[in-house]
Curated annotation (Swiss-Prot):
Its EC number is 7.3.2.5. It is a peripheral membrane protein. Residues 2-233 form the ABC transporter domain. One of its GO terms (molecular function) is ATP binding. It comes from Mesorhizobium japonicum (strain LMG 29417 / CECT 9101 / MAFF 303099). The complex is composed of two ATP-binding proteins (ModC), two transmembrane proteins (ModB) and a solute-binding protein (ModA). This is Molybdenum import ATP-binding protein ModC.
Length: 370
């Protein structure tokens, strides 16, 4: 699964210059409003013709301005899901789904309708009209319609932006299933750190029409200096963990990560199941000696590998915990009082572990103190 983009385009006074390559299952285009995310995704879709450059999906050239190649949008085999579901109001859910297949030649169809219905959990909705659906249900149907076009690439332009938190919690698990159970590469537009940290395998961060960072999610999400101001407090470490064991005596689950063991309340998951967790920099304290007499359960030893200025009186400290970097945001006064320096051995005291319990028996975001 690969997507390669190297394009330039000007829209009035706004210019987009984007170059990135991703082989991840779900690539997030991330940045604040006005950073060029939607313009870029529209060029990939064929809705905007770039002034220069090339776009390739799975080795297939869609755009190459030097070679005079521009594949029209209806021949790109790209599925698209927008902020609003854009379902046909006079059609039932079943008819909306079938519409996705009408313009795909029979020999190019690979999507099975029953499998898509099962994947998205929309079987009970088939006889309804869009007016009788919730926002989350409409988006699931829109995703199903896009999948039934048998696309080679799925573009999702802020599909959760118009939903409240409850509806987001409803639909996120289905996007995760789509990412994990299909072989369709996904490009996902968002300005939410929580969404990107949960869903993305790779991130392309945009600002003022340019790519300012790209790479694996766990690396890019640590660039607190590049996050939108309103999202900076959500940045930090993203860790892919696995369930090691359950401590039934205390009702806890122990997760294994590169940074060390992390204890959280009991999860309804089997040993070995994957869990992605997020540790925000603002939720990490630093100790120069292993602390005692604390309620915090998650204390990770490490070495300081980075110290950089933050906003106002804050500094951001990167701690290498057995190969995984955990970030802490503390004050400069605290840094000086603790005499923190590069190479110093410290303990990261994690006050809160955040993750989404989509597959853990709940389905709502969870923040675990300690």
């Amino acid at each position: 699964m690969s997507v390669r983009v190297d394009i330039g385009h000007r829209l009035g006074d706004f210019a987009v210059e984007a170059r990135f390559e991703s082989a991840g299952r779900l690539t997030a285009l991330f940045g604040p409003s006005g950073s060029g995310k939607t313009t870029l995704i529209n060029m990939i879709a064929g809705l905007i013709r770039p002034d220069k450059g090339c776009i390739e999906v799975e080795g297939r050239v869609l755009v190459d301005t030097d070679a005079g190649i521009f594949v029209p949008k209806h021949r790109r085999r790209i599925g698209m899901v927008f902020q609003d579901a854009r379902l046909f109001p006079h059609m039932s859910v079943a008819s909306n789904l079938r519409y996705g297949r009408w313009f795909t030649p029979a020999k190019e169809r690979y999507a099975d309708m029953d499998a898509v219905i099962d994947l998205l959990g929309i079987g009970p909705l088939l006889g309804r009209r869009p007016a009788k659906l919730s926002g989350g249900e409409k988006q699931r149907v829109a995703i199903g319609r896009a999948l039934l076009a048998s696309p080679g690439l799925l573009l999702m332009d802020e599909p959760l932006a118009s939903l409240d938190e409850a509806r987001k919690a409803e639909i996120l698990p289905y996007i995760e299933r789509l990412r994990d159970e299909t072989k369709i590469p996904i490009v996902y537009v968002s300005h939410s750190v929580a969404e990107v940290a949960r869903l993305a395998s790779d991130v392309v961060m945009l600002a003022q029409g340019k790519v300012v960072a790209s790479g694996p999610t766990e690396a890019v999400m640590q660039r607190l200096d590049l996050l939108p101001a309103e999202e900076r407090g959500e940045g930090g470490a993203v860790l892919d963990t696995k369930v090691l064991r359950h401590d039934e005596a205390f009702g806890m689950t122990v997760l294994g990560s590169a940074a060390g063991e992390i204890r959280v309340p009991r999860l309804a998951m089997q040993t070995g199941a994957p869990v992605r967790v997020r540790i925000r920099a603002r939720d990490v304290m630093i100790a120069t000696e292993k602390p005692t007499g604390l309620s915090a359960l998650n204390i990770l030893p490490g070495t300081i590998v980075a110290i950089s200025p933050g906003e106002g009186p804050a500094v951001e400290v990167g701690i290498d915990c057995n190969g995984a970097t955990v970030l802490a945001r503390i004050t400069e006064q605290s840094r000086q009082a603790l005499e923190l320096r590069l190479g110093g051995n410290v303990f990261a005291v994690v006050k809160t572990v955040s993750f989404d319990r989509a597959n853990t028996g709940a389905g709502l975001p969870l923040e675990v103190d300690g």
